[in-house]
Amino acid sequence: MANYISSVLKSLLLLLHLVFLIQQHVDSASIVKFLPGFEGSLPFELETGYIGIGEEEEVQLFYYFIKSERNPKEDPLLLWLSGGPGCSSISGLLFENGPLAMKLDVYNGTLPSLVPTTYSWTKTSSMIFLDQPVGTGFSYSRTQQYNKPSDSGEAKRIHEFLQKWLSKHQEFSSNPFYVAGDSYSGMVVPATVQEISKGNYQCCSPPINLQGYVLGNPITEHAIDYNYRIPFAHGMALISDELYESLKRVCKGEYVDPRDTECLKLVEEFSKCTKGVCQEVVIKPLCVTETPNCYIYRYLLTTYWVNDVNVRKALQINKESIGEWVRCYFGIPYTHDIKSSVPYHMNNSINGYRSLIYSGDHDLNVPFLATQAWVRSLNYSIIDNWRPWMIKDQIGGYTKTYANKMTFATVRGGGHTAEYKPYETYIMFHRWINGQPL
């Protein structure tokens, strides 16, 4: 009898614990109709919230969810991951492909303003902007007892996040689903796609309607990404013919951690030539955030805006989450355990998922030449050969389509992220997501 009572009590306690967790989930999502700095009510549907990850839900991942402005019942659902690792997804929302942007006014001590954009991907898709890994943006841990984030570990956490998010938003469970991101998320997105794909064939959880993924200037493999900086720099007239020929002859195409002393000297010469160049987009001036006439001044304005007490209140930020918000926390504890994401791309292709891989063609960090090289290494036949894609009568970039449902495209004049050419990138994405040729 005592054992029976004990068993019943345990069951009741477990039930109460589950009810408590469900209640926490319900309370953690909020509809946001007004944002400080934006005049009037928001012209789109915004939800913010936290999803608990792990057995004890010790990790709390923060997200911004914006419904498609076209037909949310049928339009695709995209998960957006910013790079870093450690860069808040606000980087995507306010700089790259969201419906709001910072107004570039000189900061005068008052709250910076927000303005609507004309290039939001939410015009045709619903989007979840996720702060990950833990410690990024407004995502935090309730305790110190959690696994240190890693590339492969994040793929599992993101998959868990999606399962829980979709269980709360079942009206989107049948929508075509895509994972998207840029920069360092090139290591995490392909692994996440594979993790979701595997999960769809396992028991106990409803399948996610995974259709494919989108990556911009993705970090893929350090040696490939770095080695192609030298030919890219030469093509952009950043180094001389003589230095380029010497580098090729002496280093034989391997420029990462050279052991040959002559090669090392030449690589150092290359570094001197490119030190004063803006790595993210070589045609922009190298400048500091605090300069009002500089493009990245918006990063400073965003920091002032996000750290305003009324903005945090509107976004329903848990007070226990973090102290000062930073756009990119580059010192985040993290294990880089995926050395190359190429095998993940291969597996995802074999499983039939669509992909759009695009490159701003003026990025020195991850040159388009590097991305082209690993795409070429997949050895798929070409369906649509290299050609310009147009916006009205202007060239938006160049594109090539492969038999594995992979489309590669450049964005002419673009940089390391979509923020440098947001309208052109939007046109490219809009066509691809709707199944149209670029």
From Swiss-Prot:
Disulfide bonds join 87-328, 251-263, 287-294. It is found in: Secreted. InterPro entries: AB_hydrolase_fold, Peptidase_S10. It holds the Pfam family Peptidase_S10. Glycans are attached at residues 108, 347, 379. Keywords: Carboxypeptidase, Disulfide bond, Glycoprotein, Hydrolase, Protease, Secreted, Signal. Belongs to the peptidase S10 family. This is Serine carboxypeptidase-like 5. It comes from Arabidopsis thaliana (Mouse-ear cress).
